[in-house]
């Protein structure tokens, strides 16, 4: 098993087990029994493309990146369950309730959340999502089948559920639809290239990479100023109305992450930064007065790079270097 794959599985298992309140460190020896990142395989996606709809059982703790139909059936009381769904950056996710057999009066529940939430931290954050937090939940026990489908605002969504009675459960169908201007994204991969475009809309958009990475910005168009200026967090870009931030941290919520640098002025040409945090984010703040765009590449840091970084860094800064 490659070090990169172990790192991916390690992070995912920590994320999922935290739903049970288990904050202790997990040592992952092998991931043969539970292998959520197998579904991120491009080869698997190609092989299944001709066999849609894809069907399989849903686990109590699960992560899925493929459209299809998924059925959960409790074989014993399952009290702390969640399924994380992730699409391509340019996709919305729609969750459709096909069949639900749970006892709402007996304490069961089935809830969809627009985004991901873990240990009180949300993605997108409350600052970046168009809806207040309470409106991001859809509770089946309250709405029933009057609202059979829920569509996310970005490429991630999740389902919380609790089922007491063995044999009870539900079936859902996951579909994806194109998103012409994706705003908040969690990357499926540790490397890639993306252009975050905000066309004359007053909103904040974040691209989250749940890996330590090097980020290279090749183009930044903010529409209101010219030239390049890198300002330290103390100076800030808040007064400009349109700017890009690079953030680092250990959780999902961008509002709780550390501001490493902000970019207030458009430029062409590479600006590179190494961020050894568990989560690195490119975040664009837009006033709505301009067409803003930032194009960047990202690459996961190799283990040797991380080891070298650790020896020469302050831990709370996750080793940021521009």
From Swiss-Prot:
- Name the Gene Ontology molecular function terms of this record: corticotropin-releasing hormone binding; peptide binding
List, alphabetically, the Pfam families matched: CRF-BP_C, CRF-BP_N
**Residues that carry a glycan:** 204
- Any idea where this protein resides? Secreted
Q: Which cysteines are joined by disulfide bonds?
A: 60-81, 104-141, 183-205, 237-264, 277-318
- GO CC entries: axon terminus; dendrite; dense core granule; extracellular space; microtubule; multivesicular body; nucleus; perikaryon
Using the record, list the residue span of the signal peptide; answer none if the entry has no such feature.
1-24
Which keywords does this chain's UniProt record carry? Disulfide bond, Glycoprotein, Secreted, Signal
Q: Which GO terms describe its biological process?
A: behavioral response to ethanol; cellular response to calcium ion; cellular response to cAMP; cellular response to cocaine; cellular response to estradiol stimulus; cellular response to estrogen stimulus; cellular response to gonadotropin-releasing hormone; cellular response to immobilization stress
Taking the record's annotation, the residue ranges forming a coiled coil are: none
Function description: Binds CRF and inactivates it. May prevent inappropriate pituitary-adrenal stimulation in pregnancy.
Family per similarity comment: Belongs to the CRF-binding protein family.
Q: What is this protein called?
A: Corticotropin-releasing factor-binding protein
- Species assigned in the record: Rattus norvegicus
- The gene that this protein is the product of is Crhbp
